[in-house]
């Protein structure tokens, strides 16, 4: 199993599953999960900044990492910060991103 397959499985099982769960259950999740989302967003932000830097340095494409920095990380931090006071639209965006993650990575896993 190569690196890209591991990344795809990780996104399908862990992140896709987490985003679907939170998107469906909305505020009916334990408080610790909001804390997890908050810190996950921070980790995603800084990790993908590093990835953009390393890709720019060697002249490779980095658009997917920018997507994580601009959309996914701030969304996770916001939902984690607002907790049970999060607006429904942000849970729906998480749900959409969960389906997108599963679909995108599933497609490339089985291609």
Annotate each predicted stretch with a short phrase.
Residues 107-111:
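Juxtamembrane boundary at the C-terminal end of a transmembrane helix
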Residues 24-28, 58-59, 76-93:
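Membrane-helix boundary connector in multi-pass membrane proteins
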Residues 43-55, 77:
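Canonical alpha-helical transmembrane segments
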Residues 8, 15, 34, 38-41, ...:
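Residues within membrane-spanning alpha-helices of integral membrane proteins
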Residues 4-8, 29-41, 61-65:
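A loop-to-helix transmembrane entry motif
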């Amino acid at each position: 199993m190569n690196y890209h397959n591991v990344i795809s499985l990780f996104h399908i099982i862990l992140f896709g599953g987490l985003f679907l769960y939170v998107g469906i259950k909305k505020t009916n999740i334990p408080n610790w999960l909001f804390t997890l989302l908050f810190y996950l967003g921070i980790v995603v932000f800084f990790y993908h900044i590093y990835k953009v830097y390393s890709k720019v340095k060697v002249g490779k494409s980095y658009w997917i990492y920018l997507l994580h920095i601009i959309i996914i990380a701030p969304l996770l931090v916001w939902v984690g910060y607002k907790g049970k006071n999060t607006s429904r639209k942000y849970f729906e965006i998480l749900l959409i991103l969960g389906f997108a993650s599963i679909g995108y990575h599933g497609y490339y896993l089985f291609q």
